[in-house]
C-alpha cells in the first residue's frame, strides 16, 4: 500500500470526517480483512459497515486486494486501506470540514510537547504553554506533515509497519526545529 495519502480534496475529507470511517481505515492498514471480519472487529452490523465501505470505496480510500473462494464456494473479498497514513491538508479545505480534523492536530502537538519534555528532561520547545501557542504549534505541525508526507506518497509499505509513520514524524519535528518554528 502507499505510505501516505494527502487529503486535499474537500469531498474526500468530507467522507473522512466520520470517526468510524477513520477506524475502518486504521484496521485495514494493519492487515487486509473481509467485511464480516471488519464488522466483528468494530462491533458494527453488516448493513452499517456496508454503508461506510461504499462511501470509502467510492473515493478509492479502500481497495480490494484479493478474492478467495472458500470451501463452501463462497467468494471472500479482502479489503485494505489505500494508504498507511492519511495526512490532512487543512489549508486546502473549507473551515466547516477542516474543523473536524483539528482535534487530531491538537492532540499531535500535545503529544510532541509531552514526549519531548519526558525524554529530554526539559522543555525542548521554546513556547509558552497557552492555548494560542499550542494551537499555533498544531497548525505548524499539520503544515509540516503535509510537506514531509509529499515525499512518501509514492513509497510502498507493508501492512502494520509503523516505522514509516515514526520516520515521517521525526522528519517533521526535525524540520520544525531547524526552521526555528520551535526552539531547542
Predicted regions mapped to residue ranges:
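Long, low-complexity, charged/polar intrinsically disordered regions in eukaryotic proteins
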Residues: 1-6
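Short, cationic-aromatic polyanion-contact patches
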Residues: 7-20, 34, 67-90
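Pre-recognition alpha-helix immediately N-terminal to the DNA-recognition helix
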Residues: 22-26
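Short capping segments at the starts of secondary-structure elements
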Residues: 30-37
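A short acidic, leucine-rich amphipathic alpha-helix
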Residues: 37-43, 56
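Key DNA-contact positions within bacterial/archaeal DNA-binding proteins
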Residues: 47, 54
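Glycine-centered, phosphate/nucleic-acid-interacting loop/turn motifs that mediate DNA/RNA or nucleotide
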Residues: 60-61
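Amphipathic alpha-helical dimerization/coiled-coil segments
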Residues: 82-138, 150-158, 162, 182-184
